[in-house]
């Protein structure tokens, strides 16, 4: 997805949203949007993460993978919780794609999760925090 035009990104966004809503995902929910980022240089990937964080986004931990040729590739997600509206995601991409390109990274599109309109509670907890410290409860019990 590195060389996608803004029009291609917008078309893909609308297709993803349409598919989610057609499958019954909750149109009124807040969605965790994960913009997928990759780079062959870990130090440059970190610079992208720092810039994204400074721009107000959350970032996931980096992972090391291998590309199709067995070469190490580093990846992480730039994350925001927003309404599932194309205009919001378009604006995020307009901000993030140049930021990623500035450091020679790869923008590999975005994804989210199905939101069940009949769910009793938010799977991320009452505070809506996606990146809660999973060990916080363990520390409090000690």
Curated annotation (Swiss-Prot):
Family: Belongs to the RraB family.
Disordered: annotated span: 117-142
GO cellular component terms listed in the entry, alphabetical order: cytoplasm
Subunit structure: Interacts with the C-terminal region of Rne.
Entry superkingdom: Bacteria
Pfam families (UniProt xref): RraB (PF06877)
Localization per record: Cytoplasm
Gene Ontology MF: a single term: endoribonuclease inhibitor activity
Gene name linked to the record: rraB
Keywords assigned by UniProt, alphabetized: Cytoplasm
Entry-linked Gene3D superfamilies: RraB-like
Regions annotated as coiled coil: none
Protein's name according to its UniProt entry: Regulator of ribonuclease activity B
Task performed by this protein: Globally modulates RNA abundance by binding to RNase E (Rne) and regulating its endonucleolytic activity. Can modulate Rne action in a substrate-dependent manner by altering the composition of the degradosome.
